Amino acid sequence: MAQNETVTLECIRKEIGDENLPVKGVMFGGDGAVGKTSMYLYYFLEKKEPKYIPVKVETDYGPKIYTYKKTGEKVGIYYDDHEGGGEDWDRLRHLGYERADVVVLCFSIGSRKSFDNIEEYWYPFVQKHASKAPIVLCGTQTDMRTDQFYLDRLAEHNQKPITNVEGKKLAQKIKAVGYFECSSVEGRGVKELFDAAAEATHPDITKTKSEECSVM
């Protein structure tokens, strides 16, 4: 473990108030403007935010103390987000992924490009820099499936929202340990996603499965 990472973990333990507590990291990845920051606001502050909120290149969230459901063990979880910014940020971004215990890859239900980029860019990036970390796949902004404004905008480009079936197939293709859908606007599925990511940091996570958190 690098010295700067050791210092970071020590600081996290002090912030939590338990210097002996195990610490695990969850990295959120995906294109910009898919709703990652809105998810954080809802999860940490219970604040619904329908607008796009730009974030810095790297933003950390947490830490939070989490109790594993199966074992009852406590662990400190910290969350990182390296905003989508293209290949120019690869050198900076890979440092965060290399120390991640779990990676959550996010795409917007209303953006075919962000969906395609999971397989074309983000999954290869994770395989290169965090190959041992379990992946959780998340389709965000599910409210776009029923929002006529967004449906009309997609129709102008002969597009439709990403379906649940498409999301599950992609999860299987990238060997994700889980597939979830959520909406920060409606407040659905966010807590379940964060809980699943925390659970996936447990070392007993060994097999691939695809599951859905219903948000309809």
Model feature map: region roles:
Residues 206-216:
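Extreme C-terminal disordered tails of eukaryotic proteins encode short linear targeting/docking signals used
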